[in-house]
Amino acid sequence: MSGVCHSRRQALYGLAGLLASSPCLRAAQAPELVGEAPGRMTPIDEFANVPEFEEMARRSLSERAFRRIAGGGRSALERITFRARMMVNTKALDLSLELFGQPMFAPILVGPASRQGQLDSDGELATAEGAGAAKATLVTAERSGTPFAKTIAAAPGAWRQFYPDSDVGALSERIQAAVEAGARTICLSLGEERGGRAGVPVRYGWDVLEQLRDAAAVPFVLKGVMQPADALEAAHRGIAGVVVSNHGTGQAQGEAEPVAVLPAIAEAVAGRIPLLVDGGFRRGGDVLKAIALGATAALVCRPVLWGLAAYGATGVQKVVEMLQTELAKDMVQVGAVNLAAIRRDHIRIHSR
C-alpha cells in the first residue's frame, strides 16, 4: 500500500476506535437536504451522505441527462438491517482485500458507464482521477470518450469492460490491446450488443467465452450473471469471477434485483470464484450487506456519476471516500474487524 493509502487506513482505524468506545455507536443519519434555493450548489464538504449528491446532479444537468443516472432499484437492500454486536475490539479495522491478485484499499469498485462526457466536460478522465485519488479500482467501459491509456495513467490498476461482438476475432484483438495498455482485469458484459442486428443482442456460448478468456491472459470476469447455474458453470470453465448484475439481461421488466439473487448464487459457487455485485448501492452499509450475503466486493456506479456531474473529479473522490468511511463505521457496528469477519448473522432480512 502507498503512503497515502496507509495514512487513510490509519484514519479509519482512529474512527473505528472512537466509535467502539462511544456510548452511542452510530449517530443518527443526517436529514436529506431541505430548504435549498433552486440552483444553489451545496459546498462539497457540507454533505452528510452520498444520496445528497443526487439532488446536486439534478441541478447540474438537463432533465434528459439526469434521467440516465437517476433512481435505481433498492427494495432488496432496504429490507436488510444490521444486528449490532458489542464488546468487540475493532481498533485494528481493515477494509482491504486482494482480488485477482490485485491489492485493494476497500471492497468498493467504481463501476463502468459510457458517455460520461454528457455529465462533465472531462468525462471518464475525471472519474479516473477521482477514483485514483480515493484509492478505488476503476472499471472502465469500452464505449468511453477517453483513451484507455489516459484512464489507466490516472487510475492505475483499472479494469476494462467489453461487450459481445459478432466479430469475435476483432473483440479478441481489442481485449489484447487493453491488456497491453495495462488493464489488470477484463470484464465482459453479457447481453449487450455490438455488431449484431438492431435490437438483437449478440449471445455467446461457453466455447466463445473460453476463447476470449484465453485471449485476455489476465483475469477474465463475466458481468450480468443472475442464475446460480451460470455462475457455477463459469467457475468450472475457468472464468476468474462473475458480477451479479441485471444489466446483462437489459433490466427487463420484472427482473430481480442482483442483491436478491446473490445468496443463491453464493451458495452454488461455494467460494470457488469471487462474486462481485452491482445495483442500488448508495451507502457504505449497502456494501456490508452484500458481503454478508456472499459477495466479495461491490461495483458502485450511479452515485459516482452524481458526484461527477455536480463536482467533477472532486465529486467522484468524495463519493467514494464517503462510502469507504460509512463501510468502516458499519463494520464497527456489527463487530467485524475485517472483511473476512463479516457473516450472514450480522444482518437480518425482512420480508417487507
What are these regions (language model features)?
Residues 172-277, 293-295:
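Alpha/beta enzyme core
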Residues 108-111, 138-140, 158-162, 186, ...:
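Hydrophobic faces of well-ordered beta-strands that scaffold small-molecule active sites
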